[in-house]
Amino acid sequence: MTEKPIQLGLAGLGTVGSGVYETLYRNHSLLEARSKIPFRIKRIAVRNLNKHRETAVPEELLTDDWHELVGDPEIDIIIELIGGTRQAYDLVTTALRAGKPVVTGNKALLAEYGAEIFKLSAEMGTPIYFEASAGGGIPIIQSLQNSLICNHINSIVGIINGTSNYILSAMGEHGADYEDALVQAQKLGFAEEDPSLDVNGWDAAHKALILATLAYGTTISPDKIYVSGIENITSRDFEFAKKLGYTIKLLVVIRYHENQEDALELRVQPCFVHDWHILASVNGVFNAISVNGDIVGETLFYGRGAGKNPTASAVISDVITAMRESRYPEFHTGFTPYAKSCGVMHINDTTTPYYVRFQVADQPGVIAEIARILATFGIGISATSSAPSHIDEDG
């Protein structure tokens, strides 16, 4: 008797959705051979049925109503790739209540509604999978869930936004200014027409919240994370960084401080990174995430953190996992809270070196006066560097 195929419902046929469809179609035989489970895409929900698409899809598969996916008793698994939060929330929660496992790559959705969605998943006994939500093609989610399960996570530090990293790399390596680097990123398809979430740090912040949730066993409100973007970084900052032996990267820093009431340090901000540090060599659209565990020590995950095919790879890994667990039941919620609420320390309570650049008059006693003012606030100076006055002559 031939085994009945798993039926998939795909919501969204944008960049990632088309990558998922193309890969499932192109590598169908390979995936069935490796998973030992037959499958087919039964229905695809899109916003506009008349839109021209580069990906050729049979018209009979398309609908502009996602309810047709969730309401179809023959569809076993829902793949949510529509983006945004409100409609995605309705789709995901409706699917979970209908007993259909969900695969999503929606970081904004999980950052905002993760606690509610994970709770519903557990209550309904219906799993949700989200490998593609943080790190694109980098398998960081499953690593935190499984490979590093015996570790207390001391810290997670990394570069998890390809757009900002491309811009900073262009500024640091080629001397480009911010605006020119952004325009180039947009021309190459590495930045959206509206790049706000990438350059203001909030795309990375959404991913950081998901990683912190998995690492420390408790959901965290987005308003607890300190976020600063790269919009105000200039080529001058790179000049001074290079002179001091650093480069500049937009880093996610998640660090646990034992025996403190607000124990979790959680921030996204541009940071000086020593030019000998491995993260300093992560350039262009590549991402890297360093995870330090008490048993495993330091680990590093590196790869393309976004894009059509890398993200599709992560989505499909979850689809295969969902198919296996659906066919051979073994409940998996994606995230089960196991710790009490963990307070997040205020950015003012963190201790870390900072780089500060002053534009001052070229006269005796200026540096001494700056040192005096900083000292009144208990701030010491580790190193100073001054540049010829012509560097700052245009402000």
Question: Which sequence ranges carry the predicted segments?
Answer:
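Flexible, glycine/charged-enriched surface loops at secondary-structure junctions
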Residues: 38, 195-198, 219-227, 249-250, ...
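Rossmann-fold NAD(P)-binding glycine/threonine-rich loop
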Residues: 88-98, 105-145
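Rossmann-like NAD(P)H-binding beta-loop-alpha module
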Residues: 122-203, 210
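Glycine-rich phosphate/pyrophosphate-binding beta-alpha loops
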Residues: 297-299, 303-309
